[in-house]
Amino acid sequence: VLQPVIHPPSLVLARAVTRSLTSAGLSQAVTYAFVDPARLKAMGWDAPEALIALQNPISAERSVLQPSLAPGVLEVVALNGTRQIPDVRVFEIGQTFAPHREEDGDRPAHEELWLAVAMTGLRAPRAWHAARDRIDIYDVKGAAELPVQAAGVGDAETTPYAPGEGPRYLEQGRAALG
């Protein structure tokens, strides 16, 4: 008798998030888990001790494990731009890596499952009858709410920034959402 397959909760959640974002018109990206430390530094990553270097990298540009999904999705946006595709709605669900922590047990590195979304260009596909409105913060906010709903989280409260304050991309080597 075959036993039913029981999927880990993280996989069930990742699939629900993927369905919600693809049904909203975003494309899923699958990028390398190896990134360029110089690119991370250019993006403001100032915690080299939090990077895990590969012993045998495939190239100098792919020599550390990704501490964030942002470099990968931004690389996808840039690559589309070089191919004259300015309207991009992309997301990635993937592992990020940090140095080993006590709670990791036998694992050599700390791994976390993250979601990254990047959107740029026009809101609607280019057509003679379509409005030429550009993607704005409200489009991104709407895309961010989809995975929250897919995860079954109820209404979330948000705290607006005080005048003069705003989100920072990276803070102390951890991704910041804002």
What are these regions (language model features)?
Residues 1-178:
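Extended beta-strand-rich architecture
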